[in-house]
């Protein structure tokens, strides 16, 4: 093999190693957003649900502040169950249909169906739960876990 070919091969290998270190992007958030819009018939933009309460953001801790926040906690728990089954919920693309106010999951493999069911349940829960503008809060201050709060008081 020529030295130039070895250099090209080495460059490709280094590029692939660098690309593998890039975190995957949450691909299904667009689908989840579409399910939310379908379920609530476009009454509230999806971005309103970001940073709502203690669980409607990345991660979550503490006690859910209301019914809508409980929807988000249930959704987080559902994604946790999906991960235990070997699924990657943020990367799972699935099929669904939007019938006004009644989205439905379509066919797919076990993980796609499971993740779609998580998103569908959350979207329907969001649609029926009241939205309180006061709960778009700073989670670092308001949503500490009980253990963390106990440690601070000792």
From Swiss-Prot:
Catalytic site: 75, 119
Disulfide bonds: 38-98, 54-143, 56-72, 71-125, 78-118, 87-111, 105-116
Molecular function GO terms recorded: calcium ion binding; calcium-dependent phospholipase A2 activity; phospholipid binding; toxin activity
EC class (word): hydrolase
Propeptide, residue positions: 22-27
Binding, Ca(2+): 55, 57, 59, 76
EC code: 3.1.1.4
Gene Ontology biological process terms from the UniProt entry: arachidonate secretion; lipid catabolic process; phospholipid metabolic process
Entry's localization field: Secreted
Main localization of the protein described in the UniProt heading: secreted
Reactions that this protein is recorded to catalyse: a 1,2-diacyl-sn-glycero-3-phosphocholine + H2O = a 1-acyl-sn-glycero-3-phosphocholine + a fatty acid + H(+)
Tissue specificity as recorded in UniProt: Expressed by the venom gland.
UniProt KW keywords: Calcium, Disulfide bond, Hydrolase, Lipid degradation, Lipid metabolism, Metal-binding, Neurotoxin, Presynaptic neurotoxin, Secreted, Signal, Toxin
Leader sequence residues: 1-21
Source organism superkingdom: Eukaryota
Recorded coiled-coil stretches: none
Protein purpose: Snake venom phospholipase A2 (PLA2) that inhibits neuromuscular transmission by blocking acetylcholine release from the nerve termini. PLA2 catalyzes the calcium-dependent hydrolysis of the 2-acyl groups in 3-sn-phosphoglycerides.
Protein name: Basic phospholipase A2 PC20
């Amino acid at each position: 093999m020529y030295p130039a070919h070895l250099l090209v091969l080495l460059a490709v290998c280094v590029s692939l190693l660098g690309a593998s270190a890039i975190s995957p992007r949450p691909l299904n958030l667009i689908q989840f957003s579409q399910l939310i819009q379908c379920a609530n018939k476009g009454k509230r933009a999806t971005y309103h649900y970001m940073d709502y309460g203690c669980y409607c953001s990345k991660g979550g801790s503490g006690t859910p502040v209301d019914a809508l926040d409980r929807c988000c906690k249930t959704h987080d728990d559902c994604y946790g169950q999906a991960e235990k089954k070997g699924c990657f919920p943020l990367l799972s693309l699935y099929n669904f249909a939007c019938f006004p106010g009644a989205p439905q999951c379509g066919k797919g493999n076990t993980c796609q169906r499971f993740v779609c069911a998580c998103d569908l349940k959350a979207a329907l829960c969001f649609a029926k739960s009241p939205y309180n503008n006061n709960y778009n809060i700073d989670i670092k201050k308001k949503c500490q876990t009980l253990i963390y709060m106990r440690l601070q008081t000792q």
